[in-house]
Amino acid sequence: MKQKEIPYKIYLEESEMPKEWYNVRADMKNKPAPLLNPQTLQPMTAEELGAVFCDELVAQELNETDPYIAIPEEIRSFYKMYRPSPLVRAYCLEEKLDTPAKIYYKFEGNNTSGSHKLNSAIAQAYYAKKQGLKGVTTETGAGQWGTALSMACSYFDLDCKVYMVKVSYEQKPFRREVMRTYGASVTPSPSETTEIGRQILKEFPGTTGSLGCAISEAVETATTTEGYRYVLGSVLNQVLLHQSVIGLESKIAMDKYGIKPDMIIGCAGGGSNLGGLIAPFLGGKLRGEADYEFIAVEPASCPSLTRGRYVYDFCDTGKVCPLAKMYTLGSGFIPSANHAGGLRYHGMNPALSQMYEDGLLEARSVEQTSVFEAAEQFARVEGILPAPESSHAIRAAIDEALKCKETGEEKTILFGLTGTGYFDMVAYEKFHNGEMSDYIPTEEDLAKGFAGIPKIS
């Protein structure tokens, strides 16, 4: 066995938890392009955004100057239920791979929601309650975000309406029941309950849905129901801000032991986990203090960074949300029903998209059978059953560690283990039975999505 000079798990003291979120946009030389009003094509004002989002969250969304924003005491108190989360040295995985690489992962699955999503859910619910709202609406893919928000709303006694992507609603019935346990109403999307849902069902009969569809329904419900606002689990900059606690804790823990990661790897859907994990490290790179390699890993079935276009596009299928300049496959792109429901989004966070355009991070896509091979390999040696989404980062981390085995390099790798996969056993079953397929969209498939992108100069 290797000499364990560094603990298997590094836990911070409660007193070491971040008291502020880090806003990476403050350090970006090239700021992300502004959100546009879909009717006027002019930058969205705070007043316009306030019709959809909570007021304080609008202020955070538009804030590109303050590097640090204080975390309210009520949110920090809630964080203490499950944070600080552990930074784990993957000694057993290293030994299994026989690699000179040093592998670390930040484990965010140690709460009932099973993922990192609670970090932003509690913040958004807090600001909704503070504003005096009756409730909130949202979308969810695999269900972690919906679960996290239902927990947060229950804590603050808010009503919670969740539109769950239909394929995940059917694949993960128990995830649905957890949400209902916390008082949320859960509707499969697209549905007959909204005008946009009915339109999508008419245009795409038999569709299994997408995050873009679910967002449209949630926004419609929020904007047509008195006392409600829409909240979301990824994509927008306010969510990346809240998720910066992941990277901040990681950096504090690594600094305590004099560890500097060479590369930082995160799965990428809308960008919340990836952006939160890399934020403080990326800030250091932007300020010229240190250099790191950042790798975004996305599903080959929904390759927004690796095969998408960097343009203004709608954030939702129904085209009611603001336009964002991002890497996108087109808001009309309906990804195949793969088993990483939380990554089935057509676009990418605007700040991360700008960073990718500027060459600050690398992106790669992986097929789901290879992802589940990595998930199983990890589970057998590290004792955690990883979520399919998280397993995209595991795949890349293993690949990089094996490269180190070939070259003899002793690179230090940090990846984000966003959550657990206990509600994903249908996916694991299909993998074990040899029934899992790898779908990669053709150029013709992508062209259909690109055709719906608005022409904005």
Q: What name fits each language-model region?
A:
Residues 107-118, 136-145, 236-239, 265-270, ...:
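Active-site nucleophile and cofactor-binding loops and adjacent substrate-binding regions
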